[in-house]
Amino acid sequence: VPGDPKTLPTPLLVAAAETLRHLGPRRFSLTAVAETAGVSRGTVHNTLGTRDAAISAALDHLSAAFIESLTAEINQQTTLADQVAAAAVLISAHRRKKASTPRGINQGVLILLLEHGNEALIRRSVQLWKPLVRAAKHRGEVAAGTDAGRASEWIMRMLFSFELLPPIHVDLDSPRAVRRFVGDHIVAGLNGASHPTQQVKEISA
């Protein structure tokens, strides 16, 4: 089926994904994919389908690749706190790499996915974290009553903030600082630790 990521040849998917990263959805074209892949436009059209189908397939490929790289980092850790910290370090490193590229070229993968392919990314992310949260519950690392689905969504949203929000009190260029920042708060957050309500002073404009 043209445009179905499950049946598409990897080289064309990679070419489509790279084209999307470099040009963005607005400038993306089947001709550009053909030039990247070194094939004819007709081959791209017959394989990927329409321009929209090609973009969708490229986004799906990028989403799967991002989750795969995240999984590789996470699987090296044994506790939920360390797993989330490792994911945060990876996303922060990705953020630094994106910042070093020329403006208008090579759009960041995560930003691209969050803006245009967020449904697949969010679904895959939640499915990635659910068994890890359940394992943490079994180990007693987080509260037994923790809802794995809700906790996974919370982890996902927190991690994506490392890409979307600028640093204030934490040095995102330091993997050690990122690990400590996440490790100090992730378990307490999932355990629902209660703290006295503190009055926050309003900042003058």
Residue positions per predicted region:
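Hydrophobic alpha-helical connector segments
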Residues: 57, 68-101, 114, 152-155
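Amphipathic alpha-helical interaction segments
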Residues: 11, 32, 61, 82-90, ...
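Helical hydrophobic small-molecule/effector-binding pocket
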Residues: 81-107, 119-130, 187, 191
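Helix-turn-helix
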Residues: 11, 19-53, 57
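Amphipathic alpha-helical packing segments from all-alpha helical-bundle domains
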Residues: 67, 113-141, 149-153
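Short amphipathic alpha-helix in the helical subdomain of ABC transporter nucleotide-binding domains
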Residues: 5-8, 125, 129, 148-155, ...
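C-terminal peripheral helix-coil segments that are non-catalytic and often amphipathic
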Residues: 93, 127-139, 158, 164-205
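Generic hydrophobic, amphipathic alpha-helix propensity
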Residues: 7-19, 33, 54, 58-66, ...
